């Protein structure tokens, strides 16, 4: 099942969190979900021109305002000179949503292992007539150098402009899709070339998330068990057989 399902959706609530964090009742839910998609599309389209490298947009809603966290490889391109770009973006989103919008920009430390940015980079190269094999292999090498434990890239469509569509993939390292504690980043991007649309899927394995937490829990349980054993030995039995014996005072020499 792990081979077929979306790796991000498969791990939601376990090691991954939702990108829309709010709760509501009634028919307004569908309207707000649609509005979230409009916000994401607008941000990605606007910041794509600035080459900010947006990997993720997290939306949080309160009763008074909307808070948006933008994860970008180049936060300076989002903020702009003296904060001009981010202020304009906030005002435009306030006009679209009808509510006050607050924007925070979070820097992506390693863009080479972000699946969304890898897919967008390959799509950009394919649209500029770069060989798909070269683009895929180069992305894999950069990701493995940056610290990824495994990566797989699949391209499907009229690769190289041929008449018959096909799919090709390259892989390095391991991608444990069935392991829920494995932090697998996934993205799907479309490249619009002269020959037609080419689908790009990227899986990046960044290591296990819960191993340290499980080890800490195990260690804590062992400590508690040892403390219980020590307490039970110290208390002893009710008849005094388990209690510690007192030493008799040494006899004084005459």
From Swiss-Prot:
GO terms for molecular function: mRNA binding; rRNA binding; structural constituent of ribosome. CDD domains: KH-II_30S_S3. HAMAP family: Ribosomal_uS3_B. Residues 39-109 form the KH type-2 domain. NCBIfam families: rpsC_bact (TIGR01009). It comes from Chlorobaculum parvum (strain DSM 263 / NCIMB 8327) (Chlorobium vibrioforme subsp. thiosulfatophilum). It comes from the Bacteria. Residues 220-254 are annotated as: Disordered. Part of the 30S ribosomal subunit. Forms a tight complex with proteins S10 and S14. Keywords: Ribonucleoprotein, Ribosomal protein, RNA-binding, rRNA-binding. Residues 243-254 have a biased composition (Basic residues). This is Small ribosomal subunit protein uS3. Binds the lower part of the 30S subunit head. Binds mRNA in the 70S ribosome, positioning it for translation. One of its GO terms (biological process) is translation. Residues 221-242 have a biased composition (Basic and acidic residues). Belongs to the universal ribosomal protein uS3 family. PROSITE patterns: KH_TYPE_2, RIBOSOMAL_S3. Pfam families: KH_2, Ribosomal_S3_C. GO terms for cellular component: cytosolic small ribosomal subunit. InterPro entries: KH_dom, KH_dom-like_a/b, KH_dom_type_2, KH_sf_prok-type, Ribosomal_S3_C_sf, Ribosomal_uS3_bac-typ, Ribosomal_uS3_C, Ribosomal_uS3_CS.
């Amino acid at each position: 099942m792990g081979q077929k399902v979306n790796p991000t959706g498969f791990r939601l609530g376990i090691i991954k969190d939702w990108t829309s964090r709010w709760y509501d009742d009634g028919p307004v839910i569908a309207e707000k979900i649609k509005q979230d998609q409009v916000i994401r599309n607008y941000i990605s389209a606007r910041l794509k021109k600035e080459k900010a490298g947006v990997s993720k947009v997290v939306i949080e809603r309160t009763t008074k305002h909307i808070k948006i966290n933008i994860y970008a490889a180049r936060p300076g391109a989002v903020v702009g000179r003296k904060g001009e770009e981010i202020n304009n973006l906030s005002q435009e989103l306030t006009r679209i949503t009808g509510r006050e919008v607050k924007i925070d920009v979070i820097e992506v430390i390693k863009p080479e292992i972000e699946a969304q940015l890898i897919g967008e980079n390959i799509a950009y190269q394919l649209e500029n007539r770069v060989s798909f094999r070269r683009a895929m292999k180069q992305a894999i090498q950069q990701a493995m150098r940056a610290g990824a434990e495994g990566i797989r890239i699949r391209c499907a469509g009229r690769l190289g402009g041929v008449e018959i569509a096909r799919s090709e993939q390259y892989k390095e390292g391991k991608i444990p899709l069935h392991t829920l504690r494995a932090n697998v980043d996934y993205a799907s991007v479309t490249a619009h070339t002269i020959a037609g649309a080419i689908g790009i899927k990227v899986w990046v394995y960044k290591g296990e998330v819960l191993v340290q937490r499980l080890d800490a829990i195990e260690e804590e349980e062992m400590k508690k068990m040892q403390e219980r054993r020590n307490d039970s030995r110290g208390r002893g039995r009710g008849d005094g057989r388990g209690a510690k014996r007192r030493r008799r005072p040494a006899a004084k020499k005459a």
